[in-house]
A protein has these predicted regions:
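Low-complexity, polar-biased intrinsically disordered regions enriched in Pro/Ser/Thr/Gly
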Residues: 47-52, 184-187, 209-217
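Extended catalytic-interface subdomain
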Residues: 129-156, 160-207, 233, 256
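Hydrophobic alpha-helical scaffolding
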Residues: 26, 83, 109, 157-167, ...
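N-terminal catalytic cores of secreted or lumenal carbohydrate-active enzymes
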Residues: 1-156, 168, 172
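Charged, low-complexity, helix-prone segments enriched in Lys/Glu/Asp/Gln
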Residues: 49-51, 118, 162-165, 207, ...
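Aromatic/acidic polysaccharide-binding cleft in carbohydrate-active enzymes
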Residues: 139, 190-261
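A structural motif corresponding to the C-terminal end of an alpha-helix
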Residues: 4-18, 96-103, 173-192, 233-244
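Generic, ordered loop/turn and secondary-structure boundary motif
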Residues: 62, 73, 161, 258-259
């Protein structure tokens, strides 16, 4: 790979977008995560801030949005853990990062669609301490088996187009959960936690995603069915804009990131 932090920040600035970085809670360490934050946002005479300067960036990147791991609720992830373990670790990581840079916005990982109770465990641990600004949700909808790509199967077509409604129900459930927990701790000046939809899209892959492109290529197939499904979800985001204040589509493609080596 020839595309690292410096190149990503440069790309974001060129595209006039705000970077959103994810700390590696699966196989990484708290020290590595803190070093990354120091590299990006540090202003003092410290090792990683000076390393950024050495790389030609005198001013800090001022990366605002950070997430505590990725899909730690999924057994497919390296570092998968139970809700209580994730919440406990996220608490300590968030405390550390807030002390390093109080200006950042931190997102914790929820529980996908399968485990609504996991959201409760994480939020009850982190909201009373005002450690997070967002709870992250990921949603994909579509045919789970090899699809008829031209959309001739009417049942499959309507299934894909209608499935975002499940995501809207999840938004409302999580938003209600946040409100109830904040009300429970109304004696504390807790942060107004919002929802960050950090991955969303129609899920239609020719053979499903493999563990590595050399084993099974990552080949999304998008047609009118998927376009309508995404259009439905864009309307859902509009309807729930008070609860969902950050959303990023997946999977984006950056061919320039990969190199022949």
């Amino acid at each position: 790979y020839g595309f690292g932090t410096d190149e990503f920040i440069k790309f974001c600035r060129r595209m006039k977008t705000e970077p959103f970085l994810v700390w590696n809670m699966g196989t990484g360490t708290l020290e590595e995560a803190a070093a990354w934050l120091e590299y990006c946002n540090g202003t003092y005479d410290t090792y990683y801030a000076n390393l950024r300067r050495k790389h030609g960036h005198e001013e800090p990147f001022n990366v605002k949005y950070w997430q505590l791991g990725n899909e730690m609720y999924g057994v497919h992830e390296l570092g998968y853990c139970k809700a209580e373990e994730y919440a406990s670790t996220a608490r300590e990581w968030a405390k550390t990062m807030r002390r390093l840079d109080p200006s950042i916005s931190i997102a914790a990982v929820g529980g996908g669609h399968e485990d609504i109770d996991r959201y409760r465990v994480v939020l009850e641990e982190l909201i009373p301490l005002s450690l997070i600004d967002y709870i992250s949700i990921h949603s994909y909808w579509g045919h789970r088996e090899k699809s008829k790509y031209e959309g001739k199967d009417a049942e499959n077509f309507y299934q894909v187009v209608a499935e975002p409604a499940i995501s809207e129900k999840l938004i409302q459930e999580v938003a209600c959960m946040i409100s109830m927990i904040r009300r429970k701790h109304k004696d504390k000046d807790t942060r107004k936690v919002k929802i960050a939809y950090t991955e969303w899209n129609a899920w239609n892959y020719r053979e499903g995603a493999g563990l590595h492109p050399s084993i099974k290529p990552f080949e999304p197939a998008y047609h009118l069915r998927e376009a309508l499904s995404d259009a439905v979800f864009l309307n859902i985001l509009q309807r729930n804009c008070r609860e969902v204040t950050l959303a990023t589509v997946a999977q984006p493609s950056f061919p320039g990131i990969l190199t022949s080596s």
